Amino acid sequence: MTTPEYGSLRSDDDHWDIVSNVGYTALLVAGWRALHTTGPKPLVQDEYAKHFITASADPYLEGLLANPRTSEDGTAFPRLYGVQTRFFDDFFNCADEAGIRQAVIVAAGLDCRAYRLDWQPGTTVFEIDVPKVLEFKARVLSERGAVPKAHRVAVPADLRTDWPTPLTAAGFDPQRPSAWSVEGLLPYLTGDAQYALFARIDELCAPGSRVALGALGSRLDHEQLAALETAHPGVNMSGDVNFSALTYDDKTDPVEWLVEHGWAVDPVRSTLELQVGYGLTPPDVDVKIDSFMRSQYITAVRA
């Protein structure tokens, strides 16, 4: 296993809640979604995201929501995560319209698609994540009286363990087509863990199943991000989070793996290409961010 140059905050048996370690990244992304929702020309609406920030009482994120930035630099990460959210929203909407009635959100974090999207009747949305994250989300949404638009099933499990067993025990049927999202997760897994994740998903997918994978940063470089934040001061919206210390630099190529295992892979797109597809012109700061973070958004169908 290769660890980041700047030292890792990770260990093989580390654990987290919503305000620590990898769990905090889910809270941070929820903050960016909340900012995008209320910002200029939002691509998605996530009215629940702000409630997670309030419930967390995180002073940094509460400060961002209280005084949102409006410049192109200041809205960069909310904009880019809005693009990412729209990509996965569109993926599930297309799968749902095609008749797939099982959706699996891997490392669901504070994702609220079970509540936001207009699912067809009979659809079940399975959310896999560690217990403390799922418990926090359920508590906040319950306090807000949120009602899912599909049959939502929480699956408390660590992806480094035998998560397929609790998933199938929760009602997932591997004999029926399913749609899977792996959003923003891969940089936080070792190459071996990525390979194991792909293999387990593959084993659970009937013909016609679909998968979407993607992250804004398939490669995270601490020095380049710091240099960008110096040149574009408004970009620094991650507080003191050092993503390089939470991620791994050994990878399994997802496209290569999927093709070798019989999946039909659509053309890979970057966040910049997605923006153009959504009718936007990527600002210079977005181009610079993607030049070193190297976003990848992938969809594929099981033959």
Swiss-Prot record:
GO terms for biological process: methylation. Keywords: Methyltransferase, S-adenosyl-L-methionine, Transferase. This is Putative S-adenosyl-L-methionine-dependent methyltransferase MRA_1908. It holds the Pfam family LCM. SUPFAM superfamilies: S-adenosyl-L-methionine-dependent methyltransferases. Exhibits S-adenosyl-L-methionine-dependent methyltransferase activity. One of its GO terms (molecular function) is methyltransferase activity. S-adenosyl-L-methionine binds at residues 129, 158-159. It comes from the Bacteria. Belongs to the UPF0677 family. Its EC number is 2.1.1.-. It comes from Mycobacterium tuberculosis (strain ATCC 25177 / H37Ra).
